[in-house]
Regions:
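Contiguous transmembrane helix-bundle modules in multi-pass membrane proteins
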Residues: 1-33, 50-52, 66, 243-251, ...
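Membrane-interface interhelical loops and short amphipathic "cap" helices
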Residues: 1-9, 32-36, 59-93, 145-173, ...
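A conserved hydrophobic secondary-structure block that centers on an alpha-helix together
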Residues: 11-22, 28-29, 95-226, 234
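Membrane-interfacial loop-to-helix junctions in multi-pass inner-membrane proteins
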Residues: 29-50, 112-133, 195-216, 241, ...
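A generic, lipid-embedded transmembrane alpha helix
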Residues: 45-62, 135, 217-224, 285, ...
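Transmembrane-helix bundle segments that line or gate the permeation/cavity pathway
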Residues: 50-73, 77, 86-107, 111, ...
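Soluble non-transmembrane domains of integral membrane proteins
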Residues: 509-599
Length: 635
């Protein structure tokens, strides 16, 4: 009975999404405020029924209700309770329900925290978000019902994918979805402004905090996904350029351009057409990501479904969103054309260069992701586009962007002079060059690492200058300024960590017998053997490896080889972490005679990658709570 209530709750949510689209629209059209004001209560009621549905599905997992097909396919009685809870979004149907739940949370948040926005515009925004909810609820109910019953329930369920039986996957998808789905909010703000023809700087100020928060969550989600892949998959890498990784990275690049474009559009009135197209593009790419994950066109550890019918539904929805948005943009584009002159050397130019680089980088990732799919669809052959392409094309595009983020905060709006900038920054360039030269002799002669060190010093020096200037002029430290500083430092930290660990990391695949020692990067790894290891949801082997630095024992590592109920083997690495380096060990197969295949990694500064990602997200959260976003609009 409870399962039927869960299904019926989704039906009610669909009905209320229709009411949310229709009744306030009639109220706005006929100028009946009583109908228009129904948008807020309808948002709350819709969210209530979606939440009830989600709670009931989770209770089905926690109580081992194998009469539900989705539960029987993705859980069993031996699964730990944490993974039973996270199994709710471990496959296609439940992850789509999570998507709808997150969308309802964002919609409620907009209705709750947008009191400064004129009621007519807010009602229109909620109508647009209701229409998006309607599309996904329709998809969920007619192609992906998580409450489908089995006529004859099994005594035991199958199993949650062993890759997902990990704490990282319990938190990574919700954070990623908060970012993915959150891009619907700036999209709805932009569409509402286009429909109303209210395209002044006010709507830009209202849109930017929502764009910042969704971008911050997307950053956290991508960072957690990278961290999970690093320690869980056993291959020691932190980014594989997997097509589904790219599907989350592309909207992140566009959203990065969006938050910068919103800034210049709000302050200077420039790039408004850019801003509108970026808001449309960001959400469209999140829908494209949903299509790639759920259509079956990709095979990946991240994909959920292999049903082309589901993919066609999302593809149709994507075409409606993009097509309708572009038609609306074309209709209102004349209102976005504002003459705003600025010189070649100005902060506007810097932000324009930033956007061009980010969008160019996005298209290189899009090409590398979709090109193999297009060739396969047209029966022109099968190819694989991997890390060599992305590293060769993407990285050179982004290096100028990192340099620019350290220069253009010093450049004045509208017009500046080379002589002023040279005078302001010349001593810093001398100091930075000296430090890079010192690093060349003291640390490494690797050109890529030296470039990364230079970029890190460059950004750090200029952050210090900005702080000193604020202190000297007794200017206020706004949250927006603090956010910019933290996020830009985060990018520098990330770039340094990613470059150093990629260029100076060491990897060895070796055969080790009991008592044997292997020296890597000045550390001695002593293999003490392997013993059987069993838990409720798996059995396998656990290794025993001691790590010494000279005569001092610094770590005891216990890598595992697990075999789950499905028979799927999993390699669980053991890591000795620090901010300076990670020592990473994974065991492979038994080679006979007590010897095992062992993979050892030395990963310098690898933690800086995720530290940088979290700093970027923290900076965005700081910027989103800046005071100017909470000033009530005048009637």
């Amino acid at each position: 009975m409870l399962i039927e209530i869960g299904h019926f709750s989704l039906v009610l949510a669909l009905i209320f999404s229709v009411l949310l689209m229709v009744l306030p629209s009639i109220g706005l059209y006929q100028n009946k405020s009583s109908l228009a004001q129904l948008s807020k209560p309808l948002v709350w009621v819709q969210g209530f029924w979606i939440t009830i549905s989600f709670i009931i599905l989770m209770s089905a997992f926690l109580t081992n209700d194998f009469s539900v097909k989705y539960v029987a396919d993705n859980s069993n009685t031996q699964l730990p309770i944490l993974f039973k809870a996270s199994a709710v979004w471990g496959a296609h149907e439940g992850s789509l329900l999570l998507w709808v739940l997150v969308l309802s949370i964002w919609t409620i948040a907009v209705s709750l925290f947008s009191k400064r926005i004129p009621s007519d515009l807010l009602n229109l925004i909620l109508i647009i978000l209701g229409a998006i909810s309607f599309g996904f609820l329709l998809f969920l109910l007619f192609t992906s019902n998580p409450f489908e019953r089995l006529l004859i329930p099994p005594l035991e369920g199958r199993e949650l994918n062993p890759l997902l039986q990990d704490f990282g996957l319990a938190v990574h998808p919700p954070m990623l979805y908060m970012g993915y789905v959150g891009l619907a909010v700036p999209f709805a703000f932009v569409l509402a402004a286009l429909i109303r023809g209210q395209l002044d700087s006010t709507w830009l100020r209202w849109t930017r905090p929502w764009a910042l928060v969704s971008w911050a969550f997307l950053t956290v989600g991508i960072t957690l996904g990278s961290w999970w892949a690093y320690y869980e998959l056993g291959w020691g890498g932190w980014w594989f350029w997997d097509p589904v990784e790219n599907a989350s990275f592309m909207p992140w690049l566009v959203a990065t351009a969006l938050i910068h474009s919103l800034s210049v559009s709000e302050k200077r009135g420039a790039f408004r057409q850019w801003t509108v197209l970026l808001a449309i593009g960001g959400f469209s790419l999140s829908l494209l990501g949903a299509f790639l994950v759920r259509s079956g066109v990709l095979t990946s550890v991240h994909t959920f479904a292999t049903d082309p019918t589901r993919g066609l539904f999302i593809l149709l929805f994507l075409f409606i969103v993009i097509g309708g948005s572009l038609v609306l943009f074309t209709w209102r584009s004349h209102l976005l054309q504002k003459s705003n002159q600025f010189s070649l050397l100005s902060r506007e130019t810097g932000l324009l260069i930033n956007n061009i680089l980010l969008i160019t980088a996005m298209f290189t990732v899009l090409l590398g992701t979709l090109y193999p799919l297009i060739l396969d669809t047209l029966n022109l052959g099968k190819i694989s586009v991997g890390a060599p392409y992305f590293n060769a094309v993407f990285v050179p595009i982004m290096i100028p962007g990192v340099i620019a983020l350290a220069i253009f905060p010093f450049v004045r709006w509208k017009k500046d002079s080379v002589s002023r900038l040279t005078s302001l920054l010349r001593f810093n360039w001398i100091g930075i060059s000296s430090l890079i030269l010192l690093a060349r002799f003291v640390i490494t002669n690797n050109i890529y690492v030296l470039i990364a060190i230079g970029l890190f010093i460059w950004v750090t020096f200029h952050v210090i200058i900005l702080l000193a200037k604020r202190i000297r002029t007794k200017s206020k430290f706004s949250f927006a300024f603090i956010g910019m500083i933290v996020a830009h430092l985060g990018i520098a930290v990330f770039v340094l960590g990613a470059t150093v660990t990629t260029q100076l990391g060491i990897e060895k695949d070796i055969k080790m017998s009991v008592g044997e020692s292997q020296n890597i990067a000045g550390y001695d790894f002593v293999f003490n053997g392997v013993k059987p290891h069993t838990k409720d949801n798996y059995s396998g082997f656990i290794g025993d490896i001691s790590v010494y630095s000279g005569a001092n024992k610094i770590a005891q590592l216990a890598p595992e080889k697990r075999y789950y109920q499905s028979g799927m083997p999993m390699t669980e690495a053991s890591i000795d972490p620090s901010l300076a380096r990670d020592l990473y060990v994974a065991i492979g197969e038994e080679l006979g005679g007590g010897a095992w295949s062992v993979r050892i990694y030395y990963k310098p500064l690898v933690r800086w990658i995720w530290l940088g990602g979290l700093m970027i997200a923290l900076g965005a959260f700081f910027a989103a709570i800046d005071r100017r976003y909470f000033v009530r609009a005048k009637s």
